[in-house]
Amino acid sequence: MMTQMNYTGKVKRVAIIANGKYQSKRVASKLFSVFKDDPDFYLSKKNPDIVISIGGDGMLLSAFHMYEKELDKVRFVGIHTGHLGFYTDYRDFEVDKLIDNLRKDKGEQISYPILKVAITLDDGRVVKARALNEATVKRIEKTMVADVIINHVKFESFRGDGISVSTPTGSTAYNKSLGGAVLHPTIEALQLTEISSLNNRVFRTLGSSIIIPKKDKIELVPKRLGIYTISIDNKTYQLKNVTKVEYFIDDEKIHFVSSPSHTSFWERVKDAFIGEIDS
């Protein structure tokens, strides 16, 4: 969905976030040198209007988590310095094009849904997180046994390695490698995908991905105490005695700068997984 922020006559505060690779540092250096002398821009990692991520999708995920509490004020734009990145609109040789587009920017943005996660521990503490791609729960040393509850109704008893819940944009990441479907981000939904489920005459699960609409909630209730590995995008945590994990579509969204160079979702999918098609 395209919307617009009001930037009329406003100096844009820009944060530049780059990984440690040589080419990323070169791109960052060029952007710094241009913006520091431009009266229409102010370089600051504090309260930015625009966050420029330089690297790949992993770098953009890190940038998202750096500013996940300011999503209503921030727009992101990605520059890829390696192979094509799913969230990036510019390659490293297109820096001049990015600078020109930002100078002409009127505040237009493309918005994608994100995932909200609430993890309840046996002592009553609740750990909350946001994910741009997905959140997974696994039990490494033993089979994970958990009830899957949708809108307070028990759907199935799961046995296997774990569960992944992804956003529409995250549907092209780990979810796809698990055999999940690719969802267009205008479909505000969550996707639950099983990780190596056990299915036989005794234990049964649906065995396919489930698409959950925005108004619905997913709950995962582990049936055994122990240590669980929980991944939120590119961050992994070891949590002991998890009693419940809840998943929702967040009220906030991630916003990307919309410009003539913004690549449509299906173009990104094609470039990432199919490439050029012979006519």
UniProtKB/Swiss-Prot annotation:
The gene is nadK. Keywords: ATP-binding, Cytoplasm, Kinase, NAD, NADP, Nucleotide-binding, Transferase. It is an enzyme of class 2 (transferase). It catalyses: NAD(+) + ATP = ADP + NADP(+) + H(+). The active site is at D57. The lineage of its organism: Bacteria, Bacillati, Bacillota, Bacilli, Lactobacillales. HAMAP family: NAD_kinase (MF_00361). GO terms for cellular component: cytoplasm. PANTHER family: NAD KINASE. Its main location: cytoplasm. This is NAD kinase. Its cofactor is a divalent metal cation. It is found in: Cytoplasm. Belongs to the NAD kinase family. Pfam families: NAD_kinase, NAD_kinase_C. GO terms for molecular function: ATP binding; metal ion binding; NAD binding; NAD+ kinase activity. NAD(+) binds at D57, G58, N133, E134, R159, D161, T172, A173, Y174, N175, K176, S177.
